[in-house]
Regions:
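C-terminal alpha-helical interaction appendages
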Residues: 1-64
Length: 64
């Protein structure tokens, strides 16, 4: 997964007005208590980040 796809998915599921705020403020235990933005900055693969987001948002399996 590319970073652009990660941001597209976040926008789709969280909305245009909220996805960037959520990505910079919500800490994920699956990412070592990092936010999406911090995890990206630390070089965590987008696929791993998306799995953490998918679980946190309790999205359906089809969106994994």
């Amino acid at each position: 997964m590319k970073e652009t796809e990660l941001w597209q998915r976040l926008r789709l599921h969280l909305g245009a007005d909220y996805f960037r705020v959520w990505a910079s403020e919500y800490s994920h235990s699956a990412l070592g208590q990092r936010t999406v933005v911090e995890a990206l900055s630390d070089g965590v693969p987008c696929k791993i980040i998306w799995r953490a987001v998918w679980a946190a948002l309790e999205l359906p399996a089809r969106d994994r």
